[in-house]
Every structure is written in structure tokens, then in C-alpha cells.
């Protein structure tokens, strides 16, 4: 664990995309908008992503790769970077979490934690 691990805060907003979903075919599309906030004193570049996605049946998908939405953004101190992406689940409920692989301006590699967040049809849970 690096001292820089807490310098990045990740906020998430999710949305069910009804128009592109097909519940009769067990296809539930969700979008998620991620805001990555650099609370640190130096710029940080997002190099990799690692997601764990679990649906209500316990099916686990793992996604790893370079950057996000085709970018590897450098986030200056006290600024934020935002993007929107999506995922398809076989169930109307699921959970996602993971990490971003970051590198600081000084070259130190660290992980930014993406805390678990819920993907759910509106009204499914109270």
C-alpha cells in the first residue's frame, strides 16, 4: 500500500438503460458515470483499470485493460476527470468494484480503489 492510495477519490453514479435492455433475453444494460478526483499534491496518470462485476446469480466477470474509454488521462492536483461507460448483466441486479492503476508525477505506482457499487433496476430494492 502506498501513501498515495488515498489521494484519489472515486465517485460513481449508475443508470439502468431500459431502451437497450431486453429482460426477456436476460440482458440488462447499465451505464455508470465515474468521477475521479485527485486530492493529492501531484498529478496522477490513470494507466490501467481492473473491474470485478458480479450479477445476482453469482456470475463473476473480470475486466482488465489499459486506461478507460480509450484514454489514459493525467489528472492534475485538485481536479477531476469524468467518463461514462456501461456493462450488461444477465440479471436486474449486480455489483461492481475494482481499482485503477495510477502513476504519480514523481513516477510512483499506486492503486486507486473503486468501492463496491450497485447496479439495479429502479424500484427493485428499497
Curated annotation (Swiss-Prot):
Family matches, as PROSITE patterns: APAG (PS51087)
Top-level taxon of origin: Bacteria
ApaG domain ranges (all copies): 2-126
InterPro entries: ApaG_domain, ApaG_sf, Uncharacterised_ApaG
One GO BP annotation of this record: error-free translesion synthesis
SUPFAM superfamilies in alphabetical order: ApaG-like (SSF110069)
PANTHER family per the UniProt record, alphabetical: F-BOX ONLY PROTEIN 3, POLYMERASE DELTA-INTERACTING PROTEIN 2
Protein name per the record: Protein ApaG
